[in-house]
Amino acid sequence: MLIPSKLSRPVRLDHTVVRERLLAKLSGANNFRLALITSPAGYGKTTLISQWAAGKNDIGWYSLDEGDNQQERFASYLIAAVQQATNGHCAICETMAQKRQYASLTSLFAQLFIELAEWHSPLYLVIDDYHLITNPVIHESMRFFIRHQPENLTLVVLSRNLPQLGIANLRVRDQLLEIGSQQLAFTHQEAKQFFDCRLSSPIEAAESSRICDDVSGWATALQLIALSARQNTHSAHKSARRLAGINASHLSDYLVDEVLDNVDLATRHFLLKSAILRSMNDALITRVTGEENGQMRLEEIERQGLFLQRMDDTGEWFCYHPLFGNFLRQRCQWELAAELPEIHRAAAESWMAQGFPSEAIHHALAAGDALMLRDILLNHAWSLFNHSELSLLEESLKALPWDSLLENPQLVLLQAWLMQSQHRYGEVNTLLARAEHEIKDIREGTMHAEFNALRAQVAINDGNPDEAERLAKLALEELPPGWFYSRIVATSVLGEVLHCKGELTRSLALMQQTEQMARQHDVWHYALWSLIQQSEILFAQGFLQTAWETQEKAFQLINEQHLEQLPMHEFLVRIRAQLLWAWARLDEAEASARSGIEVLSSYQPQQQLQCLAMLIQCSLARGDLDNARSQLNRLENLLGNGKYHSDWISNANKVRVMYWQMTGDKAAAANWLRHTAKPEFANNHFLQGQWRNIARAQILLGEFESAEIVLEELNENARSLRLMSDLNRNLLLLNQLYWQAGRKSDAQRVLLDALKLANRTGFISHFVIEGEAMAQQLRQLIQLNTLPELEQHRAQRILREINQHHRHKFAHFDENFVERLLNHPEVPELIRTSPLTQREWQVLGLIYSGYSNEQIAGELEVAATTIKTHIRNLYQKLGVAHRQAAVQHAQKLLKMMGYGV
């Protein structure tokens, strides 16, 4: 819940000097990316911008405090300020900020700019007190903001120092409007106007000019002089002389003498107590100060000119001028030290009553009240956890004594989930074990079950499925039906364990159950996770179309709940890329893989390993070995600089071994084979993939017997576990083994099985990747004309893809080849004396590649009758009577030229 006063522009006060000369300069602010107002405290930055903002509608205002260094809090308020300016135009960003569903501030801002692209009016965003930001991540994000913000948006930043926002670059490009302390300083005329408004007896222009010069036009000094002159008999000039040369860091003595010592004791205590509040309203003031009518008291303080300012148009929220507020807080620690804990407790209670637990925690921490802090956490911690207030929770839990956590195991569980969310798996188990050792009877009942659910999640994340299964089952046995979150966690873990064990049907049912529970209780990240798992299972079972439809449901969930920036989004677009690759939709597969990299742009480069492997796979399927090599260099660098799950390593190894196969790099394959992991089992698609990598390397090295043993065992496991996609892949690799070993009938047998199974999986690129050896076999099958209709159609499609991407279309019959052929000593005399035209050579190449007459006409973009003429002519020149004879003749020519066909 956001504090309204932080998003309210300060109300323009009566008796303030209208800074006409500065307002004139600000009138052109819409021509700049950034309007920067910088000066020490008390020069009137906020007052000036509130005057400028008066009457503007398309403006958002965000007043910072120290707590805004937390990235999530900064994002929530900044987006809320934009929503304020645009009347709710950026709904997607607002939801993402509220639910913390973004990868980083920069990615959230990128989405913001997409939404703002449809906002065409001038737009202003004011950020006040930016000097309070010390978080370098926020600085970097705001530099990104300024670089990419729409042309119609102007950012207005108020700061006591020069912020780290790339100011020099903006200045060079004339995109910066600057107002500094010299310009903010009051002129003689403005000082005269100021005193005329504040003092009952006007002073001479010469006198006010001297006073203005004495304090160098510092607005706060002028205000203090006017206050002092009203409260006692000191002349304004005497006060000015005392303030001359003084600056904000040396005001304490003056403020004590001239302000605090000149108010009654009740007002003094009111000022000191209320100053602990960063913002205040009637209820807060009444509770903290003990005075009955807080609103009336605030208005009275405002009338006295005691540096209090309204924060909203309703007049409900107030705050002290930062300079005066800091002074009062320091004095409060001196003068009311004994009462201060109780004052903070009162503030915490009032904030809680108004529904702001994070503000209440701030005061409970300041009070050092562990019991109050414990009670707030017991009631609100999980809500704060779900809103990613992780830093605040961690600070709060550290402030509680261990005994307090033991008395409230829910807080131990919370601390453990915090560790889990930060991938500190070892610390989770250590914490829970310590708690179980010291808490009586914890090993029974609901809390123990919740511990086990979390432990199960840690175990599966840490690659220990057996332990995860044991713990998840224990949790589900002990958890009451109403403990939905832990039940969702345990059910999801159990489904993932069964997936790892190859029990796909049972795993699918549990993941569907997880999805149903997660949707029912709005636990959207587990709903998304379960859909991704369902898609992977369906893919493994060979039901790629159903996997596609499940992915569509996941994309819809992401759009509805604005989950685009969760890391899981990358998982989804990656498995979509795998599916598109299987169907030979390579451009779309590449685009999906690149979008996955974009989702992870704010994370460590190692996280991009799987998407990078997918990009390499696309290059290999296209036969683009140069691009694949360039990408492989990066992939191998990432592999050497990170620790990865075995599934990730298997996928990375897959493209490496494929590349070595396509380039004939036996040395690299042999070296890899000596060092790579040899899994104990092959009962899921992760392990099947690694063993397939091993078999492919063995085939490249001519170790056919070893590879056959591996592949036959893989097929046995795949058939028993119904891993149909893996079976399809295994059959294709077995086909290559038989083909290279000269076992042509076995090769044809398993190729027919693979084509038949592909009617279910839809595989195309898995055939294409095997290149010319696959093309030769498919040509023979097509020419035999014995394939069933579906397999015939698929074989032709695969052949077209191979010809397109692996350059077998004209590669053997281009002009250079024909010239060399005609000069070959063994070339048939018929070809030498009656040579084919270049077009006829192209047609012969396409006939050899398995193209029909219609397909050749389409490829060469000529009429079918023209193709028939070319074919008739080349048959006559070659001395052949039919298509099969032409193919055989072309094959002889290729062998003569040294091509292994």
UniProtKB/Swiss-Prot annotation:
All disulfide bonds of the chain are: none
By its UniProt entry, which SMART domains does this protein fall under? HTH_LUXR
What ranges are recorded for DNA binding? 853-872
Q: Which Gene3D superfamilies match?
A: P-loop containing nucleotide triphosphate hydrolases (3.40.50.300), Tetratricopeptide repeat domain (1.25.40.10), Winged helix-like DNA-binding domain superfamily/Winged helix DNA-binding domain (1.10.10.10)
Gene Ontology biological process terms in this record: positive regulation of carbohydrate metabolic process; positive regulation of DNA-templated transcription
What function does this protein fulfil? Positively regulates the transcription of the maltose regulon whose gene products are responsible for uptake and catabolism of malto-oligosaccharides. Specifically binds to the promoter region of its target genes, recognizing a short DNA motif called the MalT box.
Specify which residues bind ATP according to the UniProt entry for this protein. 39-46
Organism this protein belongs to: Escherichia coli O6:H1 (strain CFT073 / ATCC 700928 / UPEC)
Spell out the CDD domains in the cross-references: LuxR_C_like
Q: Which PROSITE patterns match?
A: HTH_LUXR_1, HTH_LUXR_2
| Protein's recorded name | HTH-type transcriptional regulator MalT
Which family does the entry's similarity section mention?
A: Belongs to the MalT family.
Name of the gene: malT
